[in-house]
């Protein structure tokens, strides 16, 4: 069962390939309101002058926790997992980041080190920006300054959600329900009727590490959610039919 489940997630990661990065950010079909890259056309043009584009295969390391943060990265396509912990010990998945996410912003602004490690779950395209070039870009554009503040606030909200999921949810079902809702909000899409849909990118083992339980318990709990009609998992996609039910578990 575990091998089949891992194979299914691997297929999903291969299926959800990131789109090719467009010639210009303004032409990118992935952009959404509220993302850092959803800036005015003139500001975007200046951003492109200080960035390049890189591609990562699946399961490739982008940066490691504790490294000097010399660059930040805008995700144009694909998905990465962020982990924290001691390198010689167990790693905890902090969250999954997708298109529109900015990685390493706080570390770059504070002239510090990366607080997490980043590894691609799928092939991904990114725009790296060197620290000094990004700081110079911010000094020239107040719109970008405000967007950077908004991104920092979003990172704080993600960290608070992570802490609440582990510390405040008393049952595994409540913690897993919170995790599904977080994934839906971070990498999913809204559906008519109030539901959400997002790609299944994590194995049950990985989800278990995020909710402090075992893989078997995650499998059993997801099965109960499906039996109750709260979620469905089909064609490598998770659909939350009744997110309010998951929320009520907390």
PLM regions and their residue ranges:
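Cyclic nucleotide-binding regulatory module and flanking cytosolic helices
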Residues: 2-58, 102, 107-109
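Cyclic nucleotide-binding regulatory domains
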Residues: 35, 44, 60-123
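ATP/adenylate-binding site constellation spanning eukaryotic-like Ser/Thr protein kinases
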Residues: 41, 77, 99-102, 123, ...
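Short aromatic/basic micro-patch
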Residues: 53, 96, 128, 201, ...
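Cyclic-nucleotide recognition modules
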Residues: 43-44, 95-161
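Residues that scaffold the ATP/ADP-binding catalytic core of kinase and kinase-like folds
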Residues: 83, 105-106, 136-137, 179, ...
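Polybasic "coupling" helices that flank or enter modular domains
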Residues: 139, 143-210
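Phosphate-/nucleic-acid-contacting segments
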Residues: 183-250
């Amino acid at each position: 069962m575990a091998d089949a489940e891992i194979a299914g997630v691997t297929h999903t990661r291969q299926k959800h390939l990131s789109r090719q990065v467009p010639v210009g950010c303004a032409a990118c079909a992935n952009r959404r309101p509220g993302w850092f890259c959803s800036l005015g056309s003139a500001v975007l043009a200046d951003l492109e002058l200080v960035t390049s584009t890189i591609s990562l295969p699946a399961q490739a390391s982008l940066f490691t926790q504790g490294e000097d943060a010399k660059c930040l990265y805008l995700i144009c396509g694909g998905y990465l997992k962020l982990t924290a912990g001691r390198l010689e010990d167990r790693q905890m998945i902090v969250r999954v980041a997708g298109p529109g996410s900015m990685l390493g912003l706080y570390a770059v602004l504070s002239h510090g080190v990366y607080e997490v490690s980043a590894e691609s779950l799928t092939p991904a395209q990114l725009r790296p920006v060197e620290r000094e070039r990004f700081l110079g870009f911010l000094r020239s554009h107040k719109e970008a300054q405000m967007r950077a503040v908004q991104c920092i606030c979003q990172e704080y909200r993600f960290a608070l959600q992570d802490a609440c999921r582990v510390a405040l949810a008393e049952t595994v079902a409540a913690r897993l329900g919170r995790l599904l809702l977080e994934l839906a909000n971070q990498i999913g899409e809204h559906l008519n009727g109030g539901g959400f849909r997002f790609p299944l990118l994590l194995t049950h083992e990985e989800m278990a590490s995020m909710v402090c339980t075992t893989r078997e318990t995650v499998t059993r709990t997801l099965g109960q959610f499906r039996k109750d009609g709260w979620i469905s998992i089909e064609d490598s996609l998770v659909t939350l039919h009744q997110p309010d039910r998951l929320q009520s578990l907390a």
